[in-house]
């Protein structure tokens, strides 16, 4: 599953 791959990490510092 790609659900584990997409940990929703924001590209903002």
From Swiss-Prot:
Q: Which residues form a coiled coil?
A: none
Q: Which UniProt keywords are given for this protein, alphabetically ordered?
A: Amidation, Amphibian defense peptide, Secreted
- The keyword Ubl conjugation appears for this protein: no
**Tissue-specificity statement:** Expressed by the skin glands.
* Localization (cell): Secreted
Listed GO biological process terms: defense response
Provide the Gene Ontology terms for cellular component: extracellular region
Name positions with the PTM Proline amide: 13
Name recorded for this polypeptide: Electrin-2.1
Which species does this protein come from?
Answer: Litoria rubella (Desert tree frog)
């Amino acid at each position: 599953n790609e659900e584990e791959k997409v940990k929703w990490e924001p590209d903002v510092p």
